[in-house]
A protein has these predicted regions:
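Extended hydrophobic/Leu-rich segments
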Residues: 35-46, 109, 483-487, 503, ...
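P-loop NTPase motor domains
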Residues: 130-422, 437-441, 447, 497, ...
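Polar low-complexity intrinsically disordered regions enriched in Ser/Thr and small residues
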Residues: 19, 37, 89, 93, ...
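Short alpha-helical interface patches
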Residues: 48, 59-112, 207-217, 261-268, ...
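Conserved ATP-driven motor cores of ASCE-family P-loop NTPases powering translocation/secretion/packaging/pilus
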Residues: 414-516
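Short, surface-exposed polybasic-aromatic patches that bind anionic ligands, especially phosphate groups
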Residues: 530-531
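Basic- and hydrophobic-enriched, low-structure N-terminal and domain-boundary segments
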Residues: 1-142, 146-151, 484, 494, ...
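A broad, low-specificity signal for short, low-complexity segments enriched in glycine/proline
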Residues: 93-101, 112, 116-126, 146-147, ...
């Protein structure tokens, strides 16, 4: 802005030379008559401004006037002051709600993301040059679900991925979404028998995806704040898991590529501490694979794992079994045996995927963490290879964001999301949660999101952060003085000072009807929270007396351990119908392997 002002001043100064020369030429004929002649001639010259007469003094007069003009410009510039009246201590003020809304909204109401009652933003990022990544912070009871999550689901204008503690959003808006033509899919970790199935193996496109899956699984199953004194055991356990997954990926039929089968293989890998030469059925399986293909990636990882003593191998297996112990539960084994979610379809069809998690138990949240990571990769791949880098919009509503482990480079993932037309709403109770999750990257995450919506709360650090974002304003103050005595008098002094637009304690006292909204490049907005009862689609939801959405069970079956189609001939019909299984003896296994190979 300063450079623009200097450029404008320079242009005006150059333009000013023209009238100076013109006036000098008008005065030149009177120069020889002295000062009195000039004073008498100027009115005459001004009465006939276009009667310019060149004379011997014309050049000299022009030079004198230009010199005087230049000196005047120099004096002006040397004494020029930069005043910002009324902004001496800060220029913060509230933004105009109507003007800001007009800049960012689509005229059609349902084409927008709802932020407050009177401010909405288009999903078309090229319209306003802002991303549609939003951080929403509000304490318990501030209306994160009612005033933000549900109204945006009711828009029914994107594909949705919703982290839904307690299943409230699904119950209240699922019927509406189906009425609007959505396929509603549910990963239900509260009542797993009602859940659609999710098998992470289905979305492994290459070896790098396998590495990501194992890395994310170990990170997501590590308790918050815990640190391992010896990372050897986790590293070795991850090598064993990689060996098992790679074996299933390249050697097993599709129906056996899942975590329940990983658990079967792990249980088949018996280790006898008193017998280093003992070969378990799992050892023999990998030995046969090595004979077939010594360079097989599963063999490489298995040999790396198997290079220790029997006691060490036993400890490694126990470490891995502890990481995967949840898959021993029949409910989770059934849920992960097959896949119904069809993740890539979120970028191509109207799909609403709800991940229901208990609000009082984080035991199974690691599965949502894996789901998020695979979703990001699937959508990015689809955007790059089918849609030229820009997907039809997918909106991640990440309620209770702090309850799910995410990759350490989530701040970089946010940057990639913006360019792929993926919208994210990170919903937190306070800023401390984000700092705890991403101690070093939390500021980068906040900076990557062009919208920040504050709904109220009681966390002091958040109050201070919001107050600092609002900035300082310049206000007028006055002081009064009084002197007593024989000639006493009163005096009043007026002056300017600065104060925060809202101090931290004023932020804490924010009326529960209002929210504070920040949009990058705009003044802060104080506006009412969105009234869900005024949404045109409220009649399809339970808030508008619509019927609740009830999701049912999905047929599925857990695969049994098998080494090939020929195995079926060894089993009776009764055995095939039974869900029970048992590990075969070494002799039986050897006989079957010989037939299979």
């Amino acid at each position: 802005m300063k450079n623009d002002d200097e450029q404008s001043s320079l242009i005006l100064a150059v333009i000013g030379i023209i009238p100076v020369i013109w006036f000098a030429l008008l005065v030149a004929p009177y120069l020889s008559s002295g000062l009195m002649g000039i004073l008498e001639g100027v009115p005459e010259a001004m009465n006939h401004p276009f009667s310019i007469q060149l004379c011997g003094d014309s050049v000299k007069t022009v030079l004198i006037f230009l010199l005087a003009y230049g000196m005047g410009i120099g004096i002006y510039l040397s004494t020029k002051k930069h005043y910002r009246r009324g902004e001496e201590h800060g220029s913060a003020k509230w933004g105009n709600v109507k003007k800001i809304n007009r800049r960012y909204r689509e005229k059609r109401f349902t084409k927008n993301k709802l932020l407050t009652m009177h401010v909405r933003i288009s999903y078309n990022m090229r319209k306003h040059l802002r991303n549609v990544l939003t951080v929403v912070i509000g304490g318990s009871g501030s209306g994160k679900t009612r005033f933000f999550a549900k109204p945006n689901l009711m828009q029914a204008n994107t594909s949705f991925v919703v982290l839904d503690p307690k299943g409230e959003n699904l119950r209240d808006t699922g019927y509406l979404l189906e009425e609007k033509g959505y396929e509603v899919r549910v990963l239900d970790l509260i009542n797993m028998e009602k859940s659609h199935c999710y098998n992470p193996f289905v979305y492994l496109k290459d070896d790098n995806d396998v590495q990501r899956l194992v890395t994310n699984l170990f990170k997501a199953t590590t308790p918050k704040g815990s640190q391992s004194n010896d990372p050897f055991w986790d590293t070795a356990a991850s090598m064993l898991l990689l060996a098992l997954i790679f074996y299933l990926r390249y050697e097993a039929p599709e129906e056996e590529q899942n975590f329940p089968m990983v658990m079967e293989m792990l249980r088949a890998g018996e280790v006898r501490e008193d017998d280093d030469q003992y070969q378990s059925p799992l050892d023999e399986l990998f030995e046969r694979l090595e004979m077939k293909n010594p360079e097989h990636i599963a063999v490489k990882y298995y040999k790396d794992y198997h290079s220790g003593s029997a006691k060490t191998l036993k400890s490694i297996q126990i470490t891995l079994a502890a990481r995967l112990e949840k898959f021993n539960l029949s409910s989770l084994a059934a849920l992960t045996a097959t896949d119904d979610l069809d993740l890539p379809s979120l970028g191509e069809r109207k799909v609403a995927l709800f991940a229901l998690i208990p609000d009082n138990d984080t035991s199974y949240n690691f599965l949502v963490s894996i789901l998020y990571t695979q979703l990001f990769q699937q959508l990015f791949y689809l955007a790059d290879h089918k849609y030229g880098g820009r997907l039809p919009v997918v909106h991640f509503l990440m309620d209770e964001f702090a309850n799910v482990s995410l990759p350490d480079d989530f701040d970089k993932i946010l940057s990639v999301m913006r360019s792929r037309e993926v919208s994210v709403s990170i919903i937190l109770q306070n800023l401390a949660q984000l700092k705890a999750l991403f101690e070093k990257q939390w500021e980068s995450i906040m900076g990557n999101c062009d919208e920040f919506l504050y709904l109220g709360g009681n966390e002091q650090g958040t109050h201070k952060y919001v107050s600092e974002l609002l900035g300082k304003a310049t206000i007028d103050t006055n002081t009064y003085g009084k002197s007593t005595g024989h000639s006493g008098n009163y005096s009043t002094n007026y002056q300017n000072t600065g104060r925060e637009l809202m101090t931290p304690d004023e932020v804490r006292m924010l009326d529960n009807r209002y929210a504070i909204l920040f949009i990058r490049g705009e003044r802060p907005i104080l506006d009412e929270k969105f009234d869900i009862l005024k949404h045109p689609n409220v009649g399809f939801t339970t808030d508008g007396n619509g019927k609740p959405y009830l999701h049912g069970a999905v047929d599925r079956a857990v695969a049994s351990i098998s080494l090939g189609d020929s195995l079926e001939g060894e089993l009776t019909d009764d055995a095939l119908e039974s869900e029970d299984y048992e590990l075969l003896s070494d002799e039986d296994l050897e006989e079957i392997i010989q037939k299979y190979v």
